[in-house]
Amino acid sequence: MDVFRFLANRHPAVLKFGWRLGMWGLGFSFWGRFLAENPANQEGFWPAVAKRWPLKGGDRNMPKGPIRLHLWHTRGALDGIIMGLWAQRTGRPWRIWTHPLVYRTLGAPDWAFSAPIDAESWKAHYTWAQSVQGILIIFHAQPPRPRAVEQGPWHALAGQIALRDARGVEIGTFSAWKSLRWLAKHPAGLPIVLEWKVLGQDGSYQV
């Protein structure tokens, strides 16, 4: 760290040259081209991911009306990408909410916590989902606990994601870093089969 601080204070031109050289080298990798050509937005990000890793299986007749989909988050960034692909394919508006404990379980620093936990944020999510009949995907740090509550217009589903690749090899639990590394190493076009193990559909799951 002292070396970097010394270079930044005494030789900023060297540091700038090193940064440009690193970015130039990154451009030759898949992730470099991916980030350069497809900024992480709804219009460019998900179609690009879906083209490289087409999602197979897991189709389910989703009920009409707003849906709360409670999931046990186990694979770091990979679960979020897979559920984003699935939700995008349904053709319905969707949002992903991640519990702060998930970040802590994955070893992320406190500043990485981006999940809204106050009542007003929850109310905004619920109002949005009800107005557009959307899907609210909620990632838990542990299996959701059933609670007998009044659901109103909501359809509540709970489950855990089980993944297998096209060869039938099960994809286990990864850290966020290993998930991205796994994605980068898989050849383009290798389909991912989504097996959605539903834990319950009795309307008794609530955050």
Listing of model-derived features with the role each one plays in the protein:
Residues 2-54, 108:
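A transmembrane-helix-recognition feature enriched in membrane-embedded lipid enzymes
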Residues 37-42, 46-207:
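Soluble catalytic domains of membrane acyltransferases
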